[in-house]
Amino acid sequence: MTAYDPQNPFAKILRGEFPCYKVYENDHVLAFLDIMPRCPGHTLVIPKAPARNILDIMPEDFAHVARAAHKIAAASMKAFKADGITVQQFNEPAGGQVVFHLHMHVMPRHNGVALLPPASRKEDGKVLEENAAKLKAALS
């Protein structure tokens, strides 16, 4: 397996070098909106610990990510009046991973509404700000 690259985009977000639409943070994880969402409210949950993917993360660090994803899923149901939630996590190129810092996708779903294709469009910043505010309110 390739070594963790500290110059990946999510590591840069953690260091404050890239901006993000943050919805949740604690000592172990950061959750922020995907700027190319597959649906409104599409959130990424990442560990603060450097980890390329599930094959590279310490189990206790992955547990923090899973707990945060659970919290975001519940808030997403409320904030977006969702009918369900899709949670995805990809590992290595053959497994569909594109950004090589472990992350979980949490996507609120509505009956009969398909997800957009991955990375098909960049969302407007105002829409992302509004969706972040909805999620933050549901988390409080």
Predicted regions and their residues:
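HIT superfamily nucleotide-processing domains
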Residues: M1-S140
